[in-house]
Curated annotation (Swiss-Prot):
Role according to the record: Participates actively in the response to hyperosmotic and heat shock by preventing the aggregation of stress-denatured proteins and by disaggregating proteins, also in an autonomous, DnaK-independent fashion. Unfolded proteins bind initially to DnaJ; upon interaction with the DnaJ-bound protein, DnaK hydrolyzes its bound ATP, resulting in the formation of a stable complex. GrpE releases ADP from DnaK; ATP binding to DnaK triggers the release of the substrate protein, thus completing the reaction cycle.
Annotated GO MF terms: ATP binding; heat shock protein binding; unfolded protein binding; zinc ion binding
Species this protein is from: Blochmanniella floridana
Residues reported to bind Zn(2+) 2: 161, 164, 183, 186
Record-given protein name: Chaperone protein DnaJ
Assigned GO CC terms: cytoplasm
Cited SUPFAM superfamilies: Chaperone J-domain, DnaJ/Hsp40 cysteine-rich domain, HSP40/DnaJ peptide-binding domain
Localization: Cytoplasm
Length: 377
């Protein structure tokens, strides 16, 4: 696989000075850092390229060798700088000495922040529209109070690593270069635990279920995530905790359907009200309101009730609307007298095919007649 040019990776010219290289490196490293792009494999790969490029271009001797011989100078002598550094070692250990000035790891292996957690919460439509405060119970890993996260039985149980003399790094020679690598004895921490904590068995963390109060803002939708910073798993060796992401799922409502900020519902009306008009009560999430039905209303007609929908979760654009779709019901279980009255009404229309009072029916049957007339020509 052909490697990309280190100058192109950092976006600098070959004449760039140390300040320009460092500035570009910091900007790109912050952008593609795995902590900012959890689960993004392409970002992690880019991050490795950036760190590898900076490791070479920030060192005058390595940069001079690269300018003369390119990547080949690092691919000789047991894999050199380019090949050996990515082969199975821990990602943060490989580049810890390069990355310390940005992310606070000095030249020792950087303690990893705790893992992020996800909690799925199911809300009613009313809770999603108006907002709610919910208590949730989340199983997680918290810092062991007995050892305060150190993993040691006592402070006397923590001793300096004899391999690296407490530095967390050891010098390795590769070809004619001398490079630093994470100490294999202490994993880059510079300290070794002689006796582990009997509470957490040396991990520095224990399992606990935390009860948290979560404020759900008004207007959330299915798929929205609410981030609770620092409420994920505790980090090891005093590293910061991860975050908790509360994933919203909204239950199906028996009356309303939702589409972004608008609500929809079907409202049944009688045949007589559709013809003569009237007033009915319709439900909203704030209670019942009156809706005026004009005469000659057809089934399927939409009536918009402004401001009776869902509030924007970001407070932009105000509330949505409630759209009521009327459905004209055909009367059932008619008495003999009612049947006769309807028959008389039908006769007054000119029979079942009288079109004077049914404009849509007239248009339909006129179209049918024309269709068959065209067939017989």
């Amino acid at each position: 696989m052909v490697k990309s040019d280190y100058y192109e990776i950092l976006g600098v010219s070959k004449n760039a000075d140390e300040r320009e290289i460092k500035k570009s490196y910091k900007r790109l490293a912050m952008k593609f850092h795995p902590d900012r792009n959890p689960g993004d494999v392409s970002a992690e790969s880019k991050f490795k390229e950036i760190k590898e490029a900076y490791e070479v271009l920030s060192n005058p001797e390595k940069r001079s060798a690269y300018d003369q011989y390119g990547h080949a100078i690092f691919e000789q002598n047991s894999g050199g700088m380019g090949g050996s550094n990515t082969g199975g070692s821990d990602f943060s250990d490989i580049f810890g000495d390069v990355f310390g000035d940005i992310f606070g790891g000095s030249r020792r292996s950087r303690s990893r922040r705790g893992s992020d957690l996800r909690y799925d919460i199911e809300l009613s439509l009313e809770e999603a529209v108006k907002g709610v405060v919910r208590e949730i119970c989340v199983p997680t890993l918290v810092t062991c109070l007995q050892c305060r996260g150190s993993g040691a039985k006592s402070s006397a149980s923590i001793v300096s690593c004899v391999t690296c003399h407490g530095h967390g790094q050891i010098q390795m020679r590769q070809g004619f270069f001398s490079v630093q690598q994470s100490c294999p004895s202490c994993n880059g921490h510079g300290k070794i635990i002689k006796e582990i904590c009997n509470k957490c068995r040396g991990s520095g963390r224990i399992e606990r279920t935390k009860t948290l109060s979560v404020k759900i803002p008004a207007g959330v939708s299915t798929g929205d995530r609410i981030r609770l910073s620092g409420e994920g798993e505790s980090g090891k060796n005093g590293a910061p905790a991860g975050d908790l992401y509360v994933q919203v799922q909204i239950k199906k409502h028996p009356i309303f359907d939702r589409e972004e900020k608008n609500l929809y519902c079907e409202v049944p009306i009688s045949f007589s009200m559709a013809a003569l008009g009237g007033e009915i009560e319709v439900p909203t999430l704030d209670g019942r309101v009156k809706l005026k039905i004009p005469p000659e209303t057809q089934t399927g007609k939409l009536f918009r009730m402004r401001g009776k929908g869902v509030k924007s979760v970001r407070g932009i654009g105000g509330h949505g609307d409630l759209l009521c779709r009327v459905v004209v019901e055909t009367p059932v279980r008619l008495s003999d007298r009612q049947k006769q009255l309807l028959q008389d009404l039908s006769d007054s229309f000119g029979g079942p095919y009288g079109h004077k009072n049914s404009p849509k029916s007239k248009t339909f049957f006129d179209g049918v007649k024309k269709f068959f007339d065209d067939l017989t020509r």
